[in-house]
């Protein structure tokens, strides 16, 4: 899902912060500092990725389109993984949060397209996501 035509600029590759055994990356969203969390955290061979939405700077990518949002979210997850020396194929679990019944099928079809060969464990939830424009949020775990 290349949505680059929606964006004027791309963020630079995330640079990990190393604190002992922990490597963390932050994407620069205001929520990370406000709520005190990392976009992704690597400890040993395990990588945990926080809930990720279709946010680019102050722009919501794929507004009103759960398929586009899902592809963009997975692109962000993939960039986070690559920043920590992993790849999308290292994902072993995802959790997909969808706003409502109208968007679940499109979100899961996009998830299925991107993870067709990987087939991680997955749980899907209906959730009252923060911000009405967000239709999909995804958490992921990887093992390298």
Sequence positions of predicted segments:
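N-terminal presequence-like segments and the immediate start of the first folded domain
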Residues: 1-75, 79-92, 98-144
